[in-house]
């Protein structure tokens, strides 16, 4: 129920309100055995960390957000998420679909979003990829909503057939993109052929809630063919395979390719009542794999008024084996509905900067302010500072504080340094402001560094941040020259013209990764 799906909202759905039984995962699942024994160590570490999240008391469900489709920027959705919630999602998603019609069906596959995924990964996040695959029953165009007849579906695994050749060419195009990510050290939560129990994609059912075993077998064969080709021929050892049917249709496990071909089981859910999915959840976790909500959002009729806090409450109360969720974009997105702050700031939720799977590039703390200002200074202050303060902190009990006068002004907190940061890819600083004063349309801030003998200015994107809430600002250091000679690190704050009075700005927990 996305990609602008015009599927009618169906309420002919049986609600299950039974008490959730206690279901535990086997030792194999807890031991996080990937389907691919040759998976690289980073991928094994990510999977093991995800699989064991339900054993924690807090910070146990990774947040995610769909960023968009290839050949379109994903930056705006990251900006919206951070401005509204003060957090960056732990997982960023892209779909390898190209919306522009191409002359050959395989060219509808595009991995133009890879660089943004690489950047997000280097900044401490995880990535997931879906593919709204074009229809191999056609030579050109996408036709992804046109059902492929079962007889043609069965031809896919015979690469000598017309459909099989097109299928193989599409696999090659996807594999090229996934291989580029592998070469950049990126592990991918790979989610192909999703919502197969629905009737809206070519690989799905032929009618509403229809099930045909022959067609299901064709689906399973196609999945396994893709898996074998990617894993054994293309040597893609960076993939975690995600199987995700839709909650609105039956037969959620009837298309399951098998434990040797799947690593995570998930549900795509655009249901008005997230608490009523117990039956589907129980069926999925009975497959003995880590569980996720691979897509969440409101039904079409509730887009714009849906309360996303219902999802995190439902996860906590009814679906405790959930290891991640992924909110969709556009009118289904948290920032176009209600409850975004509650969703991303719950104590159970893991956001970017909090992911710790034993990666080789953990965050290194440059500055905290538990004892003193550490020689940080500021400018454009008319009301004093900086000092240390316990009024707000991102880590520990103290932060750096300065009092400022609002009204179309800018301010800087900075540290003059002589540092070599050439071995790092990302710099992050957490900020906030006090609750007093009228900030008008909202304050913004960005991280900056000055490098080289000319003190060259380099800055991240401006981001709006809220009072008494933590917002993580960052700058991509891979785009900064002379990192061996960093002269200054700091944050530039701006108050809008329609602000007035006085407030305090804060800064804390300066880290590099």
Swiss-Prot record:
Originating organism: Caldalkalibacillus mannanilyticus (strain DSM 16130 / CIP 109019 / JCM 10596 / AM-001)
Example GO molecular function: mannan endo-1,4-beta-mannosidase activity
Keywords, in A-Z order: Carbohydrate metabolism, Glycosidase, Hydrolase, Polysaccharide degradation, Secreted, Signal
GO CC terms, sorted: extracellular region
Recorded catalytic activity of this chain's protein: Random hydrolysis of (1->4)-beta-D-mannosidic linkages in mannans, galactomannans and glucomannans
Additional notes on this entry: The production of the two beta-mannanases seems not to be caused by proteolytic cleavage.
PROSITE patterns: GH26 (PS51764)
Protein name: Mannan endo-1,4-beta-mannosidase A and B
């Amino acid at each position: 129920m996305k990609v602008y799906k015009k599927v009618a909202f169906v309420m002919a759905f049986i609600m299950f309100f039974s008490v959730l039984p206690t279901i535990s995962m086997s030792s194999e699942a807890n031991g996080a055995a990937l389907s691919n024994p040759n998976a690289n160590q980073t991928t094994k570490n990510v999977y093991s960390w995800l699989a064991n999240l339900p054993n924690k008391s807090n910070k146990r469900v990774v947040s995610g957000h769909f960023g968009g489709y290839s050949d379109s920027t994903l930056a705006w959705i990251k900006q919206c998420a951070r401005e509204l919630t003060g957090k960056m999602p732990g997982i960023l998603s892209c779909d390898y679909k190209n919306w522009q019609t191409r002359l050959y069906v395989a060219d509808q596959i595009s991995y133009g979003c890879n660089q943004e995924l690489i950047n997000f990964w280097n900044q401490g996040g995880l990535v997931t990829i879906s593919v709204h695959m074009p229809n191999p029953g056609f030579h050109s165009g996408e036709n992804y909503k046109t059902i492929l007849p079962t007889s043609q579906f069965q031809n896919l695994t015979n690469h000598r057939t017309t459909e099989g050749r097109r299928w193989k060419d599409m696999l090659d195009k996807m594999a090229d993109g996934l291989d580029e990510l592998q070469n950049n050290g990126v592990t991918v939560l790979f989610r192909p052929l999703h919502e197969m129990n629905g009737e809206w994609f070519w690989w799905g059912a032929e009618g509403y809630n229809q099930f045909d075993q022959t067609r299901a077998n064709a689906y399973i064969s196609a999945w396994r063919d893709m898996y074998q080709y990617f894993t054994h021929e293309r040597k893609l050892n960076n993939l975690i395979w995600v199987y995700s049917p839709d909650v609105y249709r039956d037969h959620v496990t009837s298309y399951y390719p098998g434990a040797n071909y799947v690593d995570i089981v998930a549900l795509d859910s655009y249901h008005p009542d997230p608490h009523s999915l117990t039956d589907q959840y129980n069926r999925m976790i009975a497959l003995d794999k880590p569980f996720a909500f691979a897509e969440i959002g409101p039904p079409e009729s509730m887009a714009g008024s849906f309360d996303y806090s219902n999802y995190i409450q439902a996860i906590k109360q009814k679906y405790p084996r959930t290891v991640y969720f992924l909110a969709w974009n556009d009118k289904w997105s948290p920032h176009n509905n209600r409850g975004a702050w509650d969703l991303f700031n719950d104590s159970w939720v893991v956001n970017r900067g909090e992911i710790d799977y034993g990666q080789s590039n953990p965050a290194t703390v440059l500055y905290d302010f538990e004892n003193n200002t550490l020689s940080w200074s500021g400018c454009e202050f008319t009301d004093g500072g900086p000092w240390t303060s316990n009024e707000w902190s991102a880590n520990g009990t103290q932060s750096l504080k300065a009092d400022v006068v609002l009204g179309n002004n800018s301010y800087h907190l900075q540290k003059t340094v002589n540092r070599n940061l050439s071995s790092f890819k990302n710099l992050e600083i957490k900020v906030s402001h006090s609750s007093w004063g009228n900030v008008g349309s909202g304050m913004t801030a960005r991280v900056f560094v000055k490098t080289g003998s000319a003190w060259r200015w380099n800055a991240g994107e401006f981001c709006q941040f809220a009072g008494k809430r933590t917002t993580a600002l960052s700058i991509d250091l891979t785009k900064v020259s002379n990192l061996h000679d960093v002269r200054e690190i700091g944050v530039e704050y701006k108050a809008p013209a329609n602000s007035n009075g006085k407030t305090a700005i804060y800064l804390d927990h300066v880290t590099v990764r």
